[in-house]
Amino acid sequence: MNIGAIIAATVLVAAVGLFIGVFLGVAGKKFAVEVDEKEVAVREALPGNNCGGCGYPGCDGLAAAIAKGEAPVNGCPVGGEPVGKVIAAIMGQEVVETARQVAYVKCAGTCEKTKDNYEYTGVEDCEMMAFIPGGGAKSCTYGCLGFGSCVKACPFGAIDVVNGVAVVDKEACKACGKCVAKCPKHLIELVPYEQTTFVQCSSHAKGKAVTSACEVGCIGCKKCEKACPNGAITVDNFCAHIDYSKCTNCGACKEVCPRHIIQ
């Protein structure tokens, strides 16, 4: 191969490279997606757990919504107040303080308090177990199945199954709501962090059925409802419920509960 051919090939390759470079540069400018600097800053301030507890598809979705003014600056339940304040500063807003929430499991039917109707040896998954006739092996068809689907769903390790019932570590809980969505028995709810009074039962069975299934289940006697000075507790469908916005944690309901299910 002579020197002329080598030079020609080199020039051709250089020309092709230059053309591609110019083409990509022009295309990059033409099709460039504008980046919202505030959105980027908000995204960097978020913890990055992508838990979905905010109601958006991950931290990117929440950051975009906050930047557009479609979500509150304190919309991240994981970051809480500290992250909310940082994002508020980025957006030039004042953060509206909200009460911290944590998950709570409304069941006290431990292995000692309830019994199994039969020995279950299948897949240990609450959602699958809930489809079995009778709603599971436990004598109470409303209670915690104890297989830990909520434990697996929690990205923060805030839930454990203790003696057959799921228990939440309120200090580790970030109120992302994944356990709430995962429980097939709908036993888990988000409650105020400062709340200290709870009805540890979700059964809607009548009194006799409850006493035969669980040693501590609510029998719907309404003694707690009558004792509450604030009208914060009501019995609906044979089970007591607390309105946390009215409850002062006075303990009057605890004192009169014959089943000691209010703690």
Briefly describe each language-model feature range.
Residues 2-227, 231, 254-256, 260-263:
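Ferredoxin-type iron-sulfur electron-transfer modules and their immediate structural context
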Residues 223, 233-235, 239-241:
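Strongly charged, low-complexity linkers/loops
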